[in-house]
Amino acid sequence: MGHPGQRTILVVEDELFIRMSAVGALQDEGFLVLAAKNSAEALNVLSRHSETNILMTDVRMPGYMDGLALVAQVHIDHPEICSIVVSGNASAQQARNAGAFGFVAKPYLMKTLVQAAHDCAAALGETICMHLRPSVPPTF
């Protein structure tokens, strides 16, 4: 368990190298990070980790649900979670329509991804994000 105010972020990305890179960068910034390789795994992780504050998801993934559908479902089931869509295929408008707070276009610099996580964490603290909830090792 982290210190009070520390944010827990779930990274959903089907490509192992990208997922591991994002997890490492976010951990270096002080986030507690969980990881999933697809939407089904992400929903399972969320059901077991109510401390999750932030969802950061890719859009194109194998399985029955893409990242936009995942964000929409999480917005319904866990409206307190702040979501960020990371994609080279979807638009910021599509992300907002699904209920996401933030959007990061691929390809991205890692500092851009980290800044999006910090922005979401700040929104949680200020209750600006419409989908909010004020240490678990990542699973790959």
Tell where the protein language model's regions lie, with residue ranges.
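Two-component/phosphorelay signaling modules centered on CheY-like receiver
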Residues: L16-L34
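Active-site residues of response regulator receiver
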Residues: D58-V59
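Acidic catalytic/metal-coordinating carboxylates
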Residues: N38, G63-A69
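Acidic, metal-coordinating helix/loop segments flanking the phosphotransfer/catalytic sites
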Residues: A35-I54
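Short, glycine/charged-rich "phosphate-handling" switch motifs in NTP-dependent
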Residues: F101
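A Lys-centered signature of the CheY-like receiver
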Residues: K106
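Non-catalytic signal-transmission and effector/linker regions of two-component phosphorelay proteins
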Residues: M1-L10, L16, K111-F140
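Hydrophobic/aromatic residues positioned on beta-strands within the core alpha/beta folds
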Residues: S83-V86
